[in-house]
Amino acid sequence: MQESEELAGQSAEAEDRAARLTRQDWLDLALKTLVEDGIDQVKIQSMAKKLNVARSSFYWQFESREALHSAMLDDWLRKNTSPIIERAMRPASDIISAVINVFECWLDETLFDPTLDMAVRLWARRAAEVRAVVTEADGIRVDALRRMFLRYGYPAEEALIRARTLYYTQIGQYTLEDFEEPAVRFSFGPAYLHIFTGQQPDAKHRAHLARCIEEKYFAPRRAREAR
């Protein structure tokens, strides 16, 4: 009798845990697993075990594994594409200041998560439907940058090439895992601005860039270390 009561209590506790789990809980775990272990390890049974719930509770939130995959891609698009578009559209006094605004995405991983981006690209190599989503996202990002250059008077073809250069350079660094020491990387900032825009940054631009690096890169890291 006591044993059956204990089992009933455990079952009720498990059901309570499952009821408290949200769609976002499953999605967060799926994205974390994608980044750490790849898409093959994004399995319903494995995730249910990590969450300490029954496999069936997954279906309270998603119709299928494919529905989860779709939600993962939607989340990636929201996290890694929308901020680029917003920064590219943000008003600025000149093109150098506009590009510094875009640099915020490369400095702040809450605006652009490079590990998630690379994980999705690896997934895309194995799934044509994912590759189509990635290709479309790349096109949207480049087009936002192209329109940014157009606003500052660049000819159409030059605006496209500069947009591609700005975007492909950064994605290429992530793909190659070319992670220099921050001090070294940031020391090249003014030169990158010159290459990307064809214009020399002045003291005002250098101060803007330094402020951006401090606020978006160093300050958040110091805050995390102080906790």
Regions inferred by a protein language model and the residue ranges of each:
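Hydrophobic alpha-helical connector segments
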Residues: 71, 85-119, 163-166
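Short, basic, alpha-helical segments at the C-terminal edge of helix-turn-helix-like DNA-binding modules
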Residues: 43, 74-81
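N-terminal intrinsically disordered/low-complexity leader segments
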Residues: 1-21, 202-227
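Alpha-helical bundle regulatory/interaction domains
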Residues: 2-13, 89-107, 139, 200-203
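Hydrophobic/aromatic-rich alpha-helical bundle segments in the mid-to-C-terminal region
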Residues: 152-213
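Amphipathic alpha-helical packing segments from all-alpha helical-bundle domains
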Residues: 113-118, 128-165
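Helix-turn-helix
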Residues: 25, 33-71
